[in-house]
Amino acid sequence: MKHHFGDLLDRTDDYWTTVPNIERYAYLADKEITDKELVKVLTIGKEQKHWEQVFECPHLEELTLHSPSTEQVQALKELPQKLKRIRITFLRTKDIEFITALKHLEEVIFEYVSGFSDLSPLRQLIRLKSLHLENLRRVSNFGGLEGINSLRYLHIDGTLDWNQPIDNFNFLQRLPNLEVLSLRFVINRTPFPAFLPILGLKKLRKIKIGRATFNTKEYAFLQAALPNVEGCNWDLYWDYNDNYEFLGKGAGRVGKKNPKAKVRCDEFETMFNDMKKEAEEIIKQNRFE
């Protein structure tokens, strides 16, 4: 699947200042730049003959690498140390060690980056506040994110035709300042309660999770664990296309005109409340200090 170029970044608060995806081409380094002192945003890729100008822009703050060459990626360590934001799209690489040279990065976006599996080099970015990971084909273990104490916003995503696997969510309990957790088109590989580590996130303000991404019991757990967190108020049954769609992956539906529709919805609500009670007991036994 080719990149959508949609802007999936949460523009509330100060999490993201990276230019929207569709605007990346407005900053192409495809011709000679006359006043390099004024340049703060650039886009380069293997098609840009004048890409080396990037080293002559002393005030560069943001860089997009769109289908970059190996030479361009390896040259990142030579960039001005004022670089705060980077977006890399369509890259195959054996590792992401190159990112460690960019110590001042605050916002990092990886889209369609494949060939590597270890995210731990990101730990070297001690100012990293926002991280967007989309369609990382070789990654399933996100333990490499543990210990990024500056991280406030995390988005993990797949695509319409491929779901990003996540082995477990243990890494969450070692992201002490995380405020926003966003999960889209993902596959959970951990049995219930997969989100137990989320109890350690004392600063979490918002979660963004689709209503059919996880088993119903996981949604019940999240509601019980995060009663005051924005995004945990999913409708138990959603009015959609003449049906009531029940909350949870594979939870089913009932036609609105079905004479037993109300009974089915009431039964689901009762079941969900029982799940929340079970979750509350688990939380009492496992609450992180």
Which positions does each model-derived feature cover?
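Concave beta-strand-loop units of leucine-rich repeat
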Residues: 2-96, 101-117, 121-288
